[in-house]
């Protein structure tokens, strides 16, 4: 069974309630229908019920009726969620009138449904920008305990079985924080390891990547990686992590043994933490395009409950996979 199938099966075995705020978006609705057909998750669609069911009929989506459909402009908990938002944001000057307006926004409403305990995760972004998706998540759900930095991981399914776990690698940050400081980079390492375990089922072996291996080069950007490694070890002493390592030393046993003898990670890494967003974004796209790897994500991490962001160029299959991944993150969050 391939990894995506394993992710889907784990979701089926422990169904989570996933909110889809873009309930009338075509790819989202078609993926939702397949999720409901396959029994992968319980779905909450936000939007006008008549419009959603009309589109489902038009597109031949016979299982959308199995979803819970909530109209942001008319539902029983509207005032309850507005009061919750007002309380959460009162120090920022939120009024009840302002909260009542924001509750009509599906992206805010979805996060409030999660915060109230009425859902387990959210997926959006087929229509909305990353900023629009993240803003309510950070205002309402907030970051996970001990974490101040949201980041994004990419699941890479490569054709190099000698690397990672039979070619499976997880890389972060590829999506959110442009130039992390040492503390943020340590948090990215911790969160990417958690994502690797929760989503890919890996026993994380984390490499902090650089252009230097164990002091082979001197530069302030190398110093940042070394400091981040120290902080990450303090945050999670049980985590298998090492650095700084060049990419070949992290992935290739022969090179790892030569450049970093005695390292438990060198040549065996399945989680790659890059020093900045620029490196992460370029790297995964090179692996995807030149190495013909399958890149799944980005998977947002560091938020107290899973909220994921789609590319506006996503396919129906992308939405399907990300619903299953969001469900896996929700399962892991409950187990912590």
Task: Enumerate the language-model features and the residues they cover.
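Anion-binding alpha/beta catalytic cores of soluble intermediary-metabolism enzymes, centered on
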Residues: 1-266, 271-336
């Amino acid at each position: 069974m391939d990894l995506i199938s394993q992710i889907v099966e784990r979701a089926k075995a422990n169904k989570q309630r996933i909110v889809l705020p873009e309930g009338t978006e075509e790819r989202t609705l078609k993926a939702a229908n397949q999720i409901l057909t396959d029994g992968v998750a319980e779905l909450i669609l936000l939007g006008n019920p008549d419009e959603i069911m009309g589109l489902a009929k038009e597109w031949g989506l016979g299982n959308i009726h199995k979803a819970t459909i909530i109209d942001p402009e008319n539902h029983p908990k509207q005032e309850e969620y507005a009061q919750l938002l007002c309380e959460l944001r009162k120090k920022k000057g939120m009024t009840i009138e302002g909260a009542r307006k924001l509750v009509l926004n599906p992206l805010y409403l979805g996060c409030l449904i999660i915060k109230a305990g009425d859902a387990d995760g959210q997926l959006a972004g087929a229509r909305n920008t990353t900023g629009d998706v993240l803003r309510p998540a950070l205002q309402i759900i907030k970051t996970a305990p001990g974490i101040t930095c949201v980041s994004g991981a990419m699941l890479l399914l490569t054709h190099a079985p000698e690397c990672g776990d039979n070619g499976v690698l997880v890389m972060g940050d590829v999506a959110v924080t442009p130039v992390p400081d040492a503390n943020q980079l340590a948090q990215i390492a911790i969160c990417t390891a958690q994502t690797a375990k929760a989503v890919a089922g890996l026993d994380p072996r984390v490499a902090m990547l650089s252009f230097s291996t164990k002091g082979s080069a001197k530069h302030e950007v190398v110093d940042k990686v070394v400091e981040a490694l120290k902080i990450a070890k303090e945050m999670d002493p049980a985590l298998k992590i090492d650095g700084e390592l060049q990419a070949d030393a992290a992935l290739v046993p022969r090179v790892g043994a030569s450049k970093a003898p005695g390292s438990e990670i060198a040549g065996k890494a399945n989680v790659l933490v890059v020093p900045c967003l620029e490196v992460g974004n370029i790297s995964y796209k090179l692996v995807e395009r030149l190495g013909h790897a399958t890149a799944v994500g980005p998977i947002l991490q560091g938020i107290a409950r899973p909220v994921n962001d789609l590319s506006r160029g996503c396919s129906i299959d992308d939405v399907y996979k990300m619903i299953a991944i969001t469900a896996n993150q929700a399962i892991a969050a409950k187990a912590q």
